[in-house]
């Protein structure tokens, strides 16, 4: 059950939870389309603690809470908070949980979201912890695939770019291992999927490639990620891999008729702007899906 529970990893959610979230997201999307007023979170407060830059995720969560009739208190810049004075994450968490009903946290250190959960008296949602996981982005990704194809099973899904540091990739692969799918991992050798993630992927067919051309004609889903410059400790390594892959409008001509291109955003040069108006481009729809999906998750955690 989701009620009053935290979501730190995608593995904190059962298959039944996923289906419930997607069905609830459909209802939320319908309400948004019809302009229906939702007040189920009236009187509830969400605290957003973002120790790392964010545009889509933070605004998506805050918009979702407000559209449910709730309110938001926000720390969008750790430099202006007491953490800049040396306050520990544990103490910050204790204080913020006394001000709110639910906490959404993003932090540059892997494992930080679990620490927040440990010291919080309220449910916690992980909005990204370093190169660890980003479970709500995975919910949005799965929902987008499901809405595009009607099902997630029996698809060939190619994940392209920074597989080493990309937390969206790690969460997505853990979730996809529950389905009957074929996975292609396309990356430079420097950015291959870490062994600790690969070892957790059971009963799933995975192929690894360096060349995008190996998968361009056969894939149903292209999940493209930016190279995470901020995670590199050696700038020379970053310079070796920047610009390795870039999908252009010409590439879409080689794809299946109904293939979709996704990206968790922000993008740099991984997808040309010429792709934006093609029928394959789904990344802006994917971003928009974040609102009903996060509305669904919040309402299921805090609902009566």
UniProtKB/Swiss-Prot annotation:
Catalytically driven reaction(s): carbamoyl phosphate + L-aspartate = N-carbamoyl-L-aspartate + phosphate + H(+)
Please verify whether the record's keywords include Transferase.
Answer: yes
> SUPFAM superfamilies, alphabetically?
Aspartate/ornithine carbamoyltransferase
Q: Which residues bind L-aspartate?
A: 85, 167, 226
Which key words tag this protein in UniProt? Pyrimidine biosynthesis, Transferase
Pathway where it operates: Pyrimidine metabolism; UMP biosynthesis via de novo pathway; (S)-dihydroorotate from bicarbonate: step 2/3
Q: Which EC number(s) does the record attach to this protein?
A: 2.1.3.2
* Pfam families reported in the protein's UniProt record: OTCace (PF00185), OTCace_N (PF02729)
One GO biological process from the UniProt record? amino acid metabolic process
Q: Which annotated residues bind carbamoyl phosphate? A: 56-57, 106, 134, 137, 265-266
Its top-level enzyme class, in one word, is: transferase
Q: For this protein, what is any one GO molecular function term?
A: amino acid binding
Family note: Belongs to the aspartate/ornithine carbamoyltransferase superfamily. ATCase family.
Record function comment: Catalyzes the condensation of carbamoyl phosphate and aspartate to form carbamoyl aspartate and inorganic phosphate, the committed step in the de novo pyrimidine nucleotide biosynthesis pathway.
**What does the subunit section of this Swiss-Prot or TrEMBL entry state?**
Heterooligomer of catalytic and regulatory chains.
Q: What is this protein called?
A: Aspartate carbamoyltransferase catalytic subunit
Organism, by scientific name, is Picrophilus torridus (strain ATCC 700027 / DSM 9790 / JCM 10055 / NBRC 100828 / KAW 2/3)
